[in-house]
Amino acid sequence: MNRRNISAFNQQATGKADTLYMDNKEFERALAQVVLGQPTAFKSDSAMVLLESQFKFQSEKHKQANLAWLEQNKKLKGIKTLPSGLQYRVLTEGTGPVATDSSEVEVHYEGSLLDGTEFDSSNTRQQPDTFRQNKIIKGWREALTMMPEGAGWNLSIPSYLGYGERGSGQQIPGNSTLIFKVECLKVKNNPAKK
């Protein structure tokens, strides 16, 4: 049976120092009751400890799965891995200037999660976006200072170079690796020569 180990919960709920185990159905029933504001077999403080513990467990599990994916991805032909952990594959060579920290960059891009869920796309909007180089996530900032105008790259951005443990809104969970297909259309304001 698939069981969930909720450490420290039993201490809060019953005063006993051992660990409580709940199967999936029990956990889902208790979670639904808490969300709906219905009475549960747990004290409200204990229910919060249960939820926090479960979310931390799931977040760590998600983080480890994403790190394992990056380890496998870097072995693929054509993937380059930088010391920071950023991974990229050149799709189209560019010949123009590259961005500096004070540049603005006009790009077309598609962003997705490892499961293929697309969370943003300038291509869908049929309108390129312009970003200030110093106002974007670290993974993009690093890539765009190496990516010449006219280039197209696939980026695999570890969570610590993206949105970290917190994620971003409802679409990007914490500890998510971000996959981007980026086309650098124009480097504006203080470009560096390649």
What are the functions of these language-model segments?
Residues 1-194:
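Cross-family detector of peptidyl-prolyl cis-trans isomerase
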